Amino acid sequence: MIIENNKKKALEKALDKIEKQFGKGSIMTLGENRSMDIETISTGSLSLDIALGTGGLPMGRIVEIYGPESSGKTTLTLEVIYEAQKKGKICAFIDAEHALDPIYAKNLGVDINNLLCSQPDNGEQALEICDSLTRSGAVDLIIVDSVAALTPKAEIDGEIGDLHLGLAARMMSQAMRKLAGNLKNANTLLIFINQIRVKIGTIFGSPEVTTGGNALKFYASVRLDIRKIGTIKDGDIIIGNETRVKVVKNKISAPFRQAEFQILYGNGINTEGELITLGVNHNIIEKSGSWYSYNKNKIGQGKNNACNFLKNNPNISKEISRKIREINLIK
């Protein structure tokens, strides 16, 4: 008993010393740390929000979205910006690829007049801008498109053909160490879009690797693998992609879940189509033959007509979405 009391006194003394030196709240029990209640931003896809387990992407963390070309990476991040702006959050887009289309962003609902945009000259400049925006405490969401385009200054200044082994990986590693703590303190969500490469000589396992070294993999709380799995046709004309997103890493909920949804060219994620599919799966919407019904009222014959009904009746769409979220314990 005496030993236990001595331990308790020694612990209290140590905690007091730490708090005097580093400030109140620098150390506490895990139960006292209210940051466990993680705020999230919707991805714009209800099925992906469900797969993430918390209703969206976590604030104050690093997220990596990667996949092949034209798989929907930028579209998904623009949908996240739209959802964040709906909540009144300030967003920034670091366009390292110099390829952001403002007209397309506007079509997806993004308020381009209130979206901060930077087209940096090199990788160090891009990451420094990210850090400055984060430390300001005023920006809630930052998108970097893409890691592969974050070219180190030494490589830009050098000749084509010069060897610059590991420069990008070292740059990313240093940036991650600096950014991780600042993002947490500012409660800023940082999303990196990344490309994939094929590793030559791989015999076992997947030959696909992401660019920029391993630091981003370790520091990311969520990693999403996005792939095109099919096309959507209107007659002979291709109007969109069938898309699958796999949650490869998830520090805030269970990983390895996946979501499937449609991305329509020029319009983004087909949210009404998702509501129909999820509504039928959860017995919220009834399907009899080709007819769809909600609350015993027919809403359309065929999925396209049912989608048009939901598009023209946003209150019913919100009601169905709320019921699906309640079933899946998403706020």
UniProtKB/Swiss-Prot annotation:
**One Gene Ontology CC term in the entry:** cytosol
- Which residues are recorded as binding ATP? G67, P68, E69, S70, S71, G72, K73, T74
Transcription regulation among the record's keywords? no
For this chain's UniProt record, which GO biological process terms are given?
A: DNA recombination; DNA repair; SOS response
Question: Where does this one sit in the cell?
Answer: Cytoplasm
* Entry keyword set: ATP-binding, Cytoplasm, DNA damage, DNA recombination, DNA repair, DNA-binding, Nucleotide-binding, SOS response
In terms of superkingdom, the source organism counts as Bacteria
InterPro entries, per this entry? Answer: AAA+_ATPase (IPR003593), DNA_recomb/repair_RecA (IPR013765), DNA_recomb/repair_RecA_CS (IPR020584), P-loop_NTPase (IPR027417), RecA-like_C (IPR049261), RecA-like_N (IPR049428), RecA_ATP-bd (IPR020588), RecA_C_sf (IPR023400)
What would you give as a GO molecular function for this chain, any one?
Answer: damaged DNA binding
Q: Which Pfam families match?
A: RecA, RecA_C
**Stored SMART domains:** AAA
Where mainly found?
A: cytoplasm
Briefly state the protein's biological role. Can catalyze the hydrolysis of ATP in the presence of single-stranded DNA, the ATP-dependent uptake of single-stranded DNA by duplex DNA, and the ATP-dependent hybridization of homologous single-stranded DNAs. It interacts with LexA causing its activation and leading to its autocatalytic cleavage.
Q: Which family does it belong to?
A: Belongs to the RecA family.
The name under which this protein is listed is Protein RecA
Name its species: Wigglesworthia glossinidia brevipalpis
Gene behind this protein: recA
